[in-house]
């Protein structure tokens, strides 16, 4: 039964729900594509993807396309694509929840034994899909697409990206591969491991690296966007970097403890020197200029440390609210009963389509 329905969330103890197995007709390959204001590029995406998928020797495929609250008619373009292909399954989120949430939504409803995450702007070449599948069948649980060249990015973005990956590796100990984006293939057990991670603040590159498994890599030169421009401003990239570091490392918190000890030691030595110099040589202590400078300096350090504490407290606040990662407004091409079964993978929430008999919920474990 195909479903085109509005979705609502009901709280339920998901730890007591038995996960529903995938339908017998589940495809071997799922491609998850987050979209935000990509109406002009949907047709080009279809033109690039369909020939590649048509030549694959696989037991079926599906395209899970997530419209992350677009305002330009992206979902209408996805619906038009679905009229030409039953493999297309569009999902529209109720608002813009961000790419990390959109990717999680796509993984949540992907049924394939292998799942590929692909950007809608064609900067992730569909031509690499056959090679990814080949490495997966050779035994790799995750196949990463490594950007050998990033000619489409300016020098500033390349420099800051390199700095972020280096800092992330040092502080977090979770060495996220540099020049590797979200474009990758994951085996079903990798996807299931990701879906069992309960945090609401999700830095997907870090989480994908965290779960481990056998990894293979392929190199490629990333082309420019087919249409439009990147929505990743410097401010958004900065916030993503903060999210990545604070999600995987407590080093910034520890650093202020060490820094405080060092400054206290320096202050003690300096105070001892002032006292000894005054007692032994009768040298007067200078005026208030140096004192005012020190006060301002340490006040600045305190403000920075409070800001770092605030970053961690904000993330704790988000986690304790336990809100769903996303809210689905509409979805097409999914079996209603399977959707309800899959909803148990969302910690603390279940998704029910309008009209579904909520008096007969999924079977509970005894």
Locate each region found by the language model:
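Hydrophobic helical membrane-anchoring modules
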Residues: 6-26, 203-366
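Short conserved micro-motifs on helix faces and helix-strand junctions that flank
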Residues: 34, 93-95, 184, 257, ...
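Generic recognition of well-ordered alpha-helical segments
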Residues: 44-47, 51, 76, 162-165, ...
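Conserved amphipathic alpha-helical interaction elements at protein-protein interfaces in regulatory
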Residues: 51, 55, 80, 84, ...
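Structured catalytic core of nucleotide-sugar glycosyltransferases
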Residues: 16-154
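Residues in soluble alpha-helical coiled-coils and helical-bundle/repeat scaffolds
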Residues: 36-40, 123, 127, 195, ...
């Amino acid at each position: 039964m195909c479903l085109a329905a509005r979705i609502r969330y009901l709280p339920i103890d998901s730890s007591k729900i038995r996960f529903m197995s995938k339908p017998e007709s589940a495809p071997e390959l799922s491609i998850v594509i987050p979209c935000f204001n990509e109406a002009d590029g949907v047709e080009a995406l279809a033109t690039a993807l369909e020939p590649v998928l048509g030549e694959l020797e696989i037991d079926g495929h599906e395209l899970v396309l997530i419209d992350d609250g677009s305002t330009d008619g992206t979902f209408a373009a996805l619906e038009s694509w679905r009229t030409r292909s039953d493999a297309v399954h569009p999902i529209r989120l109720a608002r813009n929840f961000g790419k990390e949430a959109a990717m999680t939504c796509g993984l949540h409803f992907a049924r394939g034994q292998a799942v590929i995450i692909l950007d809608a702007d064609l900067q992730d070449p569909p031509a690499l899909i056959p090679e990814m599948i080949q490495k997966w069948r050779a035994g790799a649980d995750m196949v990463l697409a490594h950007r050998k060249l990033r000619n489409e990015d300016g020098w500033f973005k390349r420099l800051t990206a390199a700095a972020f990956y280096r800092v992330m590796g040092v502080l977090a100990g979770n060495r996220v591969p540099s020049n590797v984006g979200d474009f990758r293939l994951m085996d079903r057990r990798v996807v299931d491991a990701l879906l069992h991670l309960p945090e609401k603040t999700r830095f997907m590159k870090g989480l994908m690296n965290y779960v481990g498994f056998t990894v293979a890599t392929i190199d490629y030169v990333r082309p420019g966007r087919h249409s439009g421009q990147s929505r990743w401003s410097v401010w958004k990239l900065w916030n993503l970097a903060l999210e990545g570091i604070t999600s995987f490392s407590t080093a910034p918190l520890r650093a202020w403890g060490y820094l405080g000890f060092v400054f206290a030691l320096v202050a003690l030595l300096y105070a001892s020197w002032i006292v000894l110099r005054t007692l032994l040589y009768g040298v007067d202590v200078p005026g208030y200029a140096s004192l005012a400078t020190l006060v301002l300096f340490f006040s600045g350090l305190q403000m920075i440390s409070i800001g770092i504490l605030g970053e961690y407290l904000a993330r704790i606040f988000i986690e304790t609210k336990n809100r769903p990662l996303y809210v689905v407004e509409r979805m097409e091409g999914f079996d209603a009963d399977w959707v309800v079964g899959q909803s148990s993978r969302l910690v603390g929430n279940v998704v029910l389509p309008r009209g579904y008999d909520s008096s007969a919920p999924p079977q509970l474990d005894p």
